[in-house]
Amino acid sequence: FPYTTLFRSKIELNASGGSGYLDNVMSNFPNKDKVITCHNFYPQRYTGLSLEHFNNCNKAMKEYGLHTAAFVSSNNNDTFGPWPVREGLCTLEMHRDMPIDVQAKHLFATGIDDVIIANCYASEEELKALSEINKEMLEFTVELVDGIPEIERKIVLEEFHFNRGDNSEYMARSTQSRVKYKGEKFPPFNTPDIKRGDIIVESDLYTRYAGELQVALKDMKNSGKSNVVARIVEEELFLLDYIEPWTKFSFKLKK
């Protein structure tokens, strides 16, 4: 190869093998601008990476400041990859059979830089769903409760949300809506006991908290003052584990 071609090339390291191999490479002080990493994909069911191992590998990559990539699998009919086994083609075993956009949301939430579809051919619907993902912010798909008032609907779907820094293990609190909508009426209208994944907008009965949006991280007894206004779809509930202090998040309506 011409020298200029080699100079512009990058070396891709296998990100799935653990940190020993990586430590060996990095001990030779390579030009990190020319080093990237990518995880494997796994065509046979039950052979994909565990989340724990995946996270440990990624931690090592990030400590070295290396770019990371991982694979998602299309669930379209008759997809195929480089091997004759056709049981999906993902990096994480837990992603097998998940909607492709949920797989990608999860990878981005873990800090992965690039997401690659491993098998052919993703459907138009899958490609569209992937194109609508916000890499910079957790976005949850939700279903609104029947009869939700317009202000509560607007708070859920249109306002900018971020969790408070003084984090609660029971809920993520987005408090700016109670400031913006101070003086508006928030009568109680739907106050069942609260389940993990429920979206709450506090009612007037909570006085100074009226209008505050909360995301339930655990099941809770409802005092009768908290309006449950929406719920995160079941397949995305595990993404709640990625809400940390100051995490930005948003919601979109299930189609």
Where are these regions (language model features)?
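N-terminal start-of-chain detector that recognizes signal peptides
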Residues: 9-11, 41, 86-88, 185-189
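Short beta-strand/loop segments at the ligand-binding rim of alpha/beta enzyme cores
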Residues: 7-11, 65-68
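Generic serine detector
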Residues: 9, 16-19, 27, 50, ...
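C-terminal functional modules
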Residues: 145-255
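Catalytic alpha/beta core domains of metabolic enzymes, predominantly
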Residues: 16-149
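Short, small-residue-biased leader/transition segments that mark boundaries at the very start
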Residues: 1-6
